[in-house]
């Protein structure tokens, strides 16, 4: 056991029924969601091991904390463990999963393990199609500033903490709630946040938007009768569902009927300024180091949660003003001097049309004088197919577009739902001439020809484009193609 794990081992009493469990194994431990839960457990004192197909920053960190990491999946890895944790991304024929079932070792979903961590804590669960990671990070930052010392599990790197998960000493657990596979229904928090609801991951819901809506209603009703739902009333589906919520509801948004309302929004570069109005208390004049109206909504959610928990306004103001951002969420990579002049590079994870539209809007508001050049990598053929016309519409809004091939995420190709098809459809609209980039070698040739002095270059998507962005930065917007491909692997 590591010294750090030893330090926190007394907190295992927060899950008393798990005392029989000593060794926990994670299949696919390098994922952000899996790795975050694993980090909390290893710091609680559990013997922890796991496997993934390659090393990454998550596995490196867990190894430093005392976890045993296996590269590659092998049935022998699970023979001496007490429980195996998997995500829905793990296939049924995974050798470790098959061995665990043969040995009658309990196999639990990632969300079930998160639910156990939350069972004996005051849980704050953040759900929604967009904004979960940023909202969860903001809530965790406010609670940290207020000396509430929360445990948190976030789907992205919280820059101020240098990690996406942390074990706190208090009763609070702040975590993302994943609706992509409906696994958030395992959670039973004290506070549930819903940022918005849109059609995404529709294979989980049989392509039925009503089933998706009903699942969010069930999520709200997992709250105890004394729990609180904090929801964005600006979202049309959330507004539609409000009459069905039979729990206390606090709404937030820009609209006049919001319980927690933002007015007077302005943006200067990466910073947003606004005033918050709440019933019966003084207005708050705030600044948050995040661009765009969508991030003001995320901040409002954090303010609403904190206000319900009687956190002082001073802590809210300071936490938002000093917020250092999250990895790959409109992340300022740097300003670079190229042969053509100065170029600003920003990297963003958004991969749904609404997310891409919000990112473009924030870029236009913060840097209206700059030409917007986007390198976009579509994520999943099924999403590209299901939201094809929306993607064509939103991607046509940039000044210059380079399209990488679809990041399949394990899916088989779907005819007519690829980047070449998107290029053709965007070109037909006549607003811009998109460029399909078939390889990183081609990008190395094309990009210098396209960039101009003063451009804002935005790398956008949820696949391996973040690695590409880092390689661009490391070599002043030129990169080692072989190294990039090896890292992207």
From Swiss-Prot:
GO MF, any single term: ATP binding
Keyword annotations of the record: ATP-binding, Cell cycle, Cell division, Cell shape, Cell wall biogenesis/degradation, Cytoplasm, Ligase, Nucleotide-binding, Peptidoglycan synthesis
Top-level taxon of the source organism: Bacteria
GO biological process terms, semicolon-separated: cell division; cell wall organization; peptidoglycan biosynthetic process; regulation of cell shape
Any single Gene Ontology cellular-component annotation: cytoplasm
InterPro entries: Mur-like_cat_sf (IPR036565), Mur_ligase_C (IPR004101), Mur_ligase_C_dom_sf (IPR036615), Mur_ligase_cen (IPR013221), Mur_ligase_N (IPR000713), MurCDEF_pg_biosynth (IPR050061), UDP-N-AcMur_Ala_ligase_MurC (IPR005758)
Subcellular location, principal: cytoplasm
Pathway field: Cell wall biogenesis; peptidoglycan biosynthesis
UniProt-listed Gene3D superfamilies: Mur ligase, C-terminal domain (3.90.190.20), Mur-like, catalytic domain (3.40.1190.10), NAD(P)-binding Rossmann-like Domain (3.40.50.720)
Keyword set includes Cell wall biogenesis/degradation: yes
EC number, as in UniProt: 6.3.2.8
Family to which this protein belongs: Belongs to the MurCDEF family.
Protein name: UDP-N-acetylmuramate--L-alanine ligase
Native source species: Shewanella piezotolerans (strain WP3 / JCM 13877)
């Amino acid at each position: 056991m590591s010294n750090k794990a030893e330090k926190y081992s007394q907190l295992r009493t927060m899950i008393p029924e798990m005392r029989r469990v000593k060794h926990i194994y994670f299949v696919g431990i390098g994922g952000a969601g899996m790795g975050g839960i694993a980090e909390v457990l290893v710091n609680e004192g559990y013997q922890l091991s796991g496997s993934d197909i390659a090393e990454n920053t998550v596995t490196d960190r867990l190894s430093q904390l005392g976890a045993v990491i296996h590269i590659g999946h092998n049935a022998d890895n699970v023979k001496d463990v007490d429980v195996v944790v998997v995500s829905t991304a793990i296939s049924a024929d995974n050798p470790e999963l098959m061995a665990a079932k043969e040995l009658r070792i309990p196999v639990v979903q990632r969300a079930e393990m998160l639910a156990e961590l939350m069972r004996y804590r005051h849980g704050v669960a953040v759900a929604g199609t967009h904004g979960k990671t940023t909202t969860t990070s903001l809530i965790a930052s406010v609670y940290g500033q207020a000396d509430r010392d929360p445990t948190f599990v976030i789907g992205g790197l919280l820059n101020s903490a240098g990690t996406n998960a942390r074990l706190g000493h208090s009763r609070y657990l702040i975590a993302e709630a994943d609706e992509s596979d409906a696994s958030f229904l395992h959670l039973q928090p004290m506070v549930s946040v819903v940022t918005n609801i849109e059609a995404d991951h529709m294979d989980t819901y049989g392509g039925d938007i009503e089933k998706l809506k009903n699942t969010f209603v069930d999520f709200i009703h997992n709250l105890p009768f004394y729990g609180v739902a904090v929801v964005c009333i600006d979202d049309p589906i959330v507004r539609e569902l409000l009459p069905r919520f039979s729990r206390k509801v606090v709404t937030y948004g820009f609209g006049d009927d919001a319980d927690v309302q933002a007015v007077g929004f302005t943006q200067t570069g990466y910073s947003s300024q606004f005033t918050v109005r709440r019933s019966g208390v003084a207005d708050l004049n705030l600044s948050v180091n995040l661009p765009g109206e969508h991030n003001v909504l995320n901040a409002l959610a954090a303010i609403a949660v904190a206000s319900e928990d009687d956190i002082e306004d001073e802590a809210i103001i300071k936490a938002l003003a000093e917020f250092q951002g999250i990895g790959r969420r409109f992340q300022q990579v740097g300003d670079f001097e190229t042969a053509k002049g100065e170029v600003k590079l920003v990297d963003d994870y958004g991969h749904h049309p609404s997310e891409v539209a919000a990112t473009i809007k924030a870029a236009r508001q913060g840097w209206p004088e700059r030409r917007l050049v986007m390198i976009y990598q579509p994520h999943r053929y099924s999403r590209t197919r299901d939201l094809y016309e929306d993607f064509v519409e939103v991607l046509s809004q940039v000044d210059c577009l380079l399209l990488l091939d679809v990041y399949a995420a394990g899916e088989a190709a779907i005819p007519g739902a690829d980047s070449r098809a998107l290029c053709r459809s965007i070109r037909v609209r006549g607003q811009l001439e998109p460029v399909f980039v078939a390889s990183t070698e081609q990008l190395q040739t094309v990009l210098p020809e396209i960039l101009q002095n003063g451009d804002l270059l935005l790398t956008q998507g949820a696949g391996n484009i973040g690695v590409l962005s880092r390689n661009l930065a490391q070599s002043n917007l030129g990169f080692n193609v072989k190294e990039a491909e090896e890292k992207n692997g």
